[in-house]
Amino acid sequence: VPVKWLSMIGKKEKKPVADRPNIDYTIYEEGIYVGYRDFDSHRKEVAYPFGYGLSYTSFRYSPPVVRMESDRIIVQCRISNDGARAGREVVQVYACAPEGMADKPYQELKGFAKTPRIGPGESCEIQIIIPMDRLSSYVPGTGWVVDPGEYTLRIGSSSRNIQQEIRLPGIPGLILPPDGRLP
């Protein structure tokens, strides 16, 4: 599921159109706390977490192996089908960033990969490449910044079903060019 809903939705507030200043444009007043970033950061109960999906089988994640390069992080993990039926799994990698120059949500999706069909008792290796610039946040007056410090990668099948975590100490701080991309 690419979006999340709160478990209990109250009555929708109705306002006349005249009270809305953004008829011809959009004002994003919520900042970075949209969807799962808001729900996960503020520990709100949800009916369906971001990334949620059903399967007729169950999967087990081995501890990940992470390789850091100057411009990217490579995450490898073995996914095993522990159930009685064949199936596929969407493996998602979320990052928890250190405190820095910009306000940040609890975690953000940084990469994902779908396994091939895995039979019962079988497993496969997946690899997810996360470009280093995906760790950046926009800081007004400065630009796109990767804050230095320890990041935690959380690996699972949804934002709330985390199977493995790994800490990455010593991520160097970077200020990216105006386009937000590493050269």
What are these regions (language model features)?
Residues 101-138:
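Intrinsically disordered, low-complexity Pro/Gly/Ser/Thr-rich segments with frequent PxxP/GP/PP motifs
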Residues 86-93, 105, 139-140:
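Short, hydrophobic/aromatic beta-strand segments
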